A protein has these predicted regions:
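Conserved donor-binding/catalytic core segment of Leloir-type glycosyltransferases
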Residues: 160, 168-186, 192-197, 206-208
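Active-site proximal beta-strand in glycosyltransferases
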Residues: 72-74, 88-106
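Short alpha-helical donor nucleotide-sugar binding micro-motif in glycosyltransferases
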Residues: 239-240, 247-252
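Aromatic "clamp/platform" in nucleotide-sugar-dependent glycosyltransferases that forms part
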Residues: 260
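Nucleotide-activated donor-binding/catalytic signature segment of Leloir-type glycosyltransferases, i.e.
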Residues: 209, 218-243
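Carbohydrate-associated surface elements
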Residues: 137, 156-159
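Membrane-proximal helix-turn-helix segments that form the acceptor-binding/catalytic region
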Residues: 103, 112-131
Length: 260
């Protein structure tokens, strides 16, 4: 890190070591920032977002208010989009939101809940000094659905690590891998529906992803697999670390992405 490095707070709710794409992005952002002369101090925020309570918001403000005067405060969108604008305005430095996906556009939300989340996130982002998104598609959504000024948005897409070609399963059955938490937006139910008519073919599906984000959906997915008679063709391995995910990638013949 150079002597003239910029320092900023990077506030992330929950455990940053959680094996999901969003948290992996946060970890890599911290590492890449250090190499580029931007020292991001990771500050954990309470779990529970985007659901909030008076106690959760009070504790969040207490932590963020400890930021040194004038330091930029980058807040992960899971929390930032749920913060009241007046709380954001009281913080000691400029606030920048990191938005992976608008909170109110999560698949499976009731219409009234989605509308409240979109309204709240629009107000929160308007109070921010800037917004970072992980894709141009998300940037477009923020402009079109939440009224964010395009000039206020910086797009910072994730990269791809170089890797050797996968060895594949080496067996007679085609090994299919799908990765993502067991939530409606990841579309694992669509994948099961697509594979069910292909039971006469020789294949096996492994789904890697946490099942505790939406327990009701995870239970419904397991029931769907059983009802389709695919209990011995589909394996749910839960959340996995990077080494185990690399091993699953290496053994796979096909990768399936069914996100809505």
């Amino acid at each position: 890190m150079s002597r003239g490095a910029v320092r900023a707070v990077f506030a992330v709710p929950g455990n940053i070591e959680t094996p999901t794409g969003g948290y992996a992005y946060a970890r890599r952002l911290i590492a890449a920032g250090r190499e580029a002369g931007l020292l991001l101090d990771h500050w954990p925020l309470p779990e529970g977002f985007p659901e909030t309570s008076l106690a959760l918001l009070a504790e969040t403000e207490r932590r963020l208010s400890l930021a040194p005067e004038g330091w930029p405060v980058l807040i992960d969108g899971l929390a930032c989009g749920a913060l009241p604008p007046d709380l954001i305005a009281r913080l000691p430095g400029p606030v920048i939101a990191l938005c992976h996906h608008p909170l109110g556009l999560e698949t499976g939300l009731r219409d009234d809940r989605a509308a409240r989340l979109l309204e709240g996130e629009a107000a929160a982002l308007e109070a921010c000094a800037g917004v970072v998104t992980t894709s141009r598609a998300t940037a477009d959504l923020l402009v079109e659905r939440l009224g964010v000024r395009r000039a206020a948005i910086t797009v910072a897409p994730p990269g791809t690590d170089p890797a050797e070609p996968a060895h594949g399963s080496g067996g007679s059955a085609v090994e299919i891998l799908s990765v993502g938490s067991l939530t409606p937006r990841k579309g694992h139910d669509l994948l099961i529906d697509a594979l069910a008519p292909l039971a006469h073919l020789d294949w096996h599906l492994t789904i890697a992803g946490a099942g505790d984000r939406d327990p009701a959906f995870a239970a419904a997915l397991e029931a769907r697999i059983a009802a389709a008679g695919l209990g011995d063709r589909v394996t749910l391995v839960g959340a996995v670390g990077e080494a185990e995910l690399d091993a699953l990638d290496d053994r796979a013949d096909l990768f399936a992405l069914a996100s809505r």
